[in-house]
A protein has these predicted regions:
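Domain-level signal for soluble alpha/beta catalytic cores
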Residues: 1-129, 143-364
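Intrinsically disordered, low-complexity proline-rich regions
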Residues: 129-132, 137-140
Length: 364
């Protein structure tokens, strides 16, 4: 199901360079060409850090996204964006993110923005051949030893969480909003596949956060209908976590409420948050690995303890007691956007080095 055992990957996001955050606060001083250069440089920086770490799978670090899912609302017509955070002071938390009003039927005539992001990543990641300046076609085969390029898209249920229901428009609750957003996300996935994307993560952290109080079978139905037209055409991953806005969780950090229902997700790789939970419920990777590749969150993005390669190797050996090497993938617990870049860089390097130690032990 993947290129080799004990694959190393990331969830999607990566810390913004300090200069990008400063520039984003002064975008009115930049022209269109300046902004293009700014984003290209930010993606190249995130990409270089991932390549230096030696990852098997890399992303653009979501350098165009203010937040994993918040930036997508700028592409959706029919909503009035919140003008300000509802709470400015005090400890950082999820309640500092407000919700957008739905004022018209929800549409996305320009897509959700992930295709241009993916094409930029492709352009920056693939080296020129024979010093040619000609662009590499999007459907070209991967170059030898080149990393897999992954895109990430929020699922419709997670996207619906930041919208206010509007019964007058036929959106009385979050479920109705989810159904309206589902075809928009599905079309975005189809467009990514058409652009040559060979791996995409359809992330529904809200499902894992609220599985304890909602019917998990309903979540399975939503997820599978979202990805049904790209199943078998690209590697579909999903990420189950408990929230990481400002490094804060929002749901009870237990996997049990999701299973066994989530085993019916029609994905090729399922990622579970483990490191921040001291690998509680690790035995659940056994049924996951029977169904698809089990991606393990093996470094804690909420902690500034830098896991050593030996730490990583010990954790991998624990995982091998529950799943075979050819079904295991290793990643951070969540996206790295809420982790300082200096720490993110070292954590990724140590993760890859730890994986390589175990590969050598296993002879794979």
């Amino acid at each position: 199901m993947k290129d080799h055992p004990l694959r190393t990957t990331v969830i999607g996001s990566y810390p913004f360079p300090g200069w990008l955050e400063f520039a984003c606060a002064h975008l009115d001083q930049f022209g269109e060409a300046d902004r293009t250069e700014l984003i290209d440089d930010a993606v190249a920086t995130a990409l270089r850090d991932q390549l230096d770490a030696g990852l098997d799978v890399v992303t653009d670090g979501e350098q165009t996204r203010l937040d994993f899912n918040l930036s997508f609302y700028g592409f959706i017509q029919g909503i009035e964006l919140e003008s300000a955070s509802p709470r400015h002071f005090g400890p950082p938390a999820h309640d500092q993110r407000g919700k957008h009003r739905v004022i018209a039927p929800l549409t996305a005539p320009r897509g959700l923005g992930t295709v241009p992001d993916y094409l930029r990543l492709q352009r920056l990641a693939l080296p020129p051949i024979s010093h040619s300046l000609l662009p590499i076609p999007s459907h070209s085969l991967p170059l030898p030893n080149s990393p897999t390029l992954k895109a990430s898209v929020p699922g419709p249920y997670t996207l619906a969480g930041r919208l206010l229901p509007n019964p007058d428009l036929g959106y009385p609750d979050r479920w109705a909003l989810t159904e309206a957003l589902l075809p928009l996300v599905r079309r975005e996935l189809e467009a990514l596949v058409a652009a040559g994307c060979r791996e995409v993560s359809v992330d529904e952290p809200s499902m894992s956060c609220y599985a304890y109080k909602e019917d998990p079978r309903r979540f399975v139905d939503i997820f599978n209908r979202t990805i049904e037209t790209v199943t078998g055409r690209t590697r579909v991953c999903t990420h189950l976590c408990f929230g990481n806005y400002k490094a804060r969780a929002v749901g009870p950090r237990q996997l049990a409420p999701m299973f066994p229902a989530f085993l019916d997700f029609k994905c090729d790789e399922m990622h579970v948050e483990m490191a921040s939970r001291e690998f509680a419920e690790l035995e659940l990777i056994t049924p996951i690995a029977r169904r698809c590749d089990a991606a393990i969150g093996i470094i804690d993005v909420k902690s500034y303890y830098l896991e050593t390669p030996d730490d990583i190797a010990r954790r991998i050996r624990r995982c091998l007691a529950f799943a075979p090497a050819d079904r295991l993938v290793f990643a951070p617990d969540c996206g790295l956007s809420q982790t300082a870049r200096w720490a993110a860089k070292q954590k990724l390097k140590n993760m890859v080095e730890g994986v390589r130690k175990v590969r050598k032990e296993l002879g794979v």
